[in-house]
Amino acid sequence: MNATPKVLAFDVFGTVVDWHGSIAAEVKRIGLPADPDAFATAWRNGYRPAMARVRSGELPWTKIDDLHRLILDGVLKEFDITHLSEDQKKHLNLVWHRLLPWEDTIEGLLRLKSKFTIVTLSN
């Protein structure tokens, strides 16, 4: 039996991208009147409770972008941020599509890809 794996799978958030640093940098870049680290943490901390609402049937199956937006709206309220336009909220919500990789991610994945099939996933 060959014990060498053929496929390597990697979680996206926290493993191949720096979600926290990326969100905090965006919060700082757009000048939100909030601590960038606290805002990023609050936004991500809303994920499990929101998913629990989906799993329980309180919310129907929801696309992740819509779930992130639902959470964002709550975090903006929590931080008393009321000045953003709808377009600004949409752009901020899509920061999850612009997460930056860790410094060694690209080189590391390319090296692994030369010997294995690689895939990313996220729950």
Role assignments for model-derived ranges:
Residues 104-115:
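Catalytic-core regions built around general acid/base machinery
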Residues 122:
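Conserved phosphate-coupling serine/threonine residues in phosphotransfer and NTP-handling enzymes
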Residues 3-103:
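N-terminal helical cap/lid subdomain that shapes the substrate entry/recognition surface
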Residues 6, 117-119:
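Structural signature of beta-strand start/N-cap positions in the alpha/beta core
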